[in-house]
């Protein structure tokens, strides 16, 4: 006997469908429930906290089973998607009444974290991306797709560090990778990783898939034809999305190559340390996005976050944004635009559901409502003068045909789903109106029949009713059932009543049920035709969504600039940063005391600042605010300062704070040194580098030596604009030994055992660190502080007696370098070829090298 014949016909059907979807959970529709069996049931029981039961037996073994009600399935799907799980939805498509065996079923959709479009399964203000990654000869191809907007991009990071930064920037909900992928550590601690066959990443297959999607002969028009690694990833990605959506993807119409030299590159540590959209605790409070994001639409909010994570270098584009923000701000247009945008809502995601033919009736109603706002938006934006704003306003012009179609076709307040009808408006289709009239006339007829029968037969308790099982019936109480005439045919007996049918009522039942069925069939046909009528407008709606998103970000930044007293930065092509009265955009919003604004000056003659001062004095805040102001300027935003001149940057690096990376087995010091090495290898003269407390995780002299050598390398070999905060006061000698360096400090004033932080940046080095005063503020017991003061005095006396050993007096040439010069012996050895030497010559060379030691 074959294995499948040991199972019931229904379980055979289930196992066949499960074999087609082995890696994911299968929701198998049975009546009013979606059931899961075997390992799926066990897994779902744990993930969803639902009961695990057993259903009879199959092949002699009890079958583990779990289930969820069909009407509540969206909530369970949302939880599974959040956990990175994918689910195949299997529906009954056959008619149980006519099925001889198990009712026919098939998988109608696959819900995955990266391809969901249902409103209930998405975070409103965060992009939902699916990505694919490919690796060859140490380089990477990486493609991302936002199914909810059609935005399809690829990039080719050249190092693991760059690839890690891209993964953090895009934060895909689902990540596809080939079976032979080597750098699997890049995907650790991530949900939604999907292993795919290697052949899905083949270049020829990828090009074929992409040309088929875009309806093109080649990819030259997209400027991606030479990005072979990126195309391998993009090909796998588009095939996977087609397989899961099981429908055409008409809104995915282009692919863009994201050139890294067009952006200010932020590595993973920098994104984390600057707290752009996520704070160090993993939340969203007290982040730059929280301060800047007052967008009126969810799609504007998502675009602003993309800008924050990918600042750009094109000065012309940035100045266009700044001009636009300035014009909106000067006219206070944001007060008129915001209320309109709040009514428009999230048409970007409605568009995706429209393209995938999964839009619901209320999506159509929301799209109609958005279209109805466009004439008012056109009136408000008619005064805009800047070409960039005028172009956006043109794309946001009224779409009268679409608006008229939706106004005629969809009821004012349609139901949630089309299943029971009641969606298409009256007057839209004559045939539908006719069938509805027949169905709706049933109520009047039944009321008249009930009154006539009650009067004719003298039965006070007679009622005409309907239920889905027995259809129409006449109900009479048990006490008056003896008054029922002979032509009443009993249909059902209840505890206190009898139910009957008569030929006249049966004839009407057939007519009504037929008209309801016909009306629903016509309505569903009209619903599908509505998608066909809207499809030609897809590109226009896509352009509309993009234009409104951009206008929303610009008006939002104008409002923020006006409300928070930001200034317009001046963007320069040459390197340098000059800020007067700069403020930290986040700290100034959350502090209860007035924020102390500070200047900064970095130029070709002043490349590095050695920053000293007490803990809690504001060094890290000062450094971060400089980076945030520079970043805000590079997204085209006004900045928190009295004035700001920002030169073009290629990268921003931060080495601020560290903690043990337990998952990778790395200590705090190892994390610190790894980040430092990344900076020393990749920073350029056009980079902004923030270095905070290098070397504190090891012994004093090791730490001091590493800090000194790192600062020296940045100053002499790289020439990056650097803010170097330290507690090693020996480093304040560097500006006396090297050109283009300066000392600045944040001061504090002691009053007995207390300390007041001034938070103001002053030229020159700090006089002391105030560490003991800070320890007192933290609550360290007074006897411990007293003992520490005594020990400090002893150490200072020892230090004064051994000044010659202080690192601050050592010549620069003798300083430890992280990348040391080769010795004379090493250079001599490198010039010797052992294969060319006779035994006598080798012996002579050995004596010569010994003398050099």
UniProtKB/Swiss-Prot annotation:
Q: Does the keyword DNA repair apply?
A: yes
InterPro entries the UniProt entry points to: DNA_mismatch_repair_MutS, DNA_mismatch_repair_MutS-lik_N, DNA_mismatch_repair_MutS/MSH, DNA_mismatch_repair_MutS_C, DNA_mismatch_repair_MutS_clamp, DNA_mismatch_repair_MutS_core, DNA_mismatch_repair_MutS_N, DNA_mismatch_repair_MutS_sf
Quote the cellular component terms of the Gene Ontology held in the record: cytosol
Keywords (A to Z) from UniProt: ATP-binding, DNA damage, DNA repair, DNA-binding, Nucleotide-binding
Any idea which positions bind ATP? 613-620
Q: Which residues form a coiled coil?
A: none
Secretion signal: which residues? none
User: Pfam families from the xrefs?
Assistant: MutS_I, MutS_II, MutS_III, MutS_IV, MutS_V
Q: Which Gene3D superfamilies match?
A: 1.10.1420.10, 6.10.140.430, DNA repair protein MutS, domain I, MutS, connector domain, P-loop containing nucleotide triphosphate hydrolases
Q: Per the UniProt entry, what is one GO biological process?
A: mismatch repair
Q: What SMART domains does its record include? A: MUTSac (SM00534), MUTSd (SM00533)
GO MF annotations in UniProt: ATP binding; ATP-dependent DNA damage sensor activity; damaged DNA binding; mismatched DNA binding
What function does the entry list?
Answer: This protein is involved in the repair of mismatches in DNA. It is possible that it carries out the mismatch recognition step. This protein has a weak ATPase activity.
As for family, the record states: Belongs to the DNA mismatch repair MutS family.
This protein is called what?
DNA mismatch repair protein MutS
Species in which this protein is naturally found: Vibrio campbellii (strain ATCC BAA-1116)
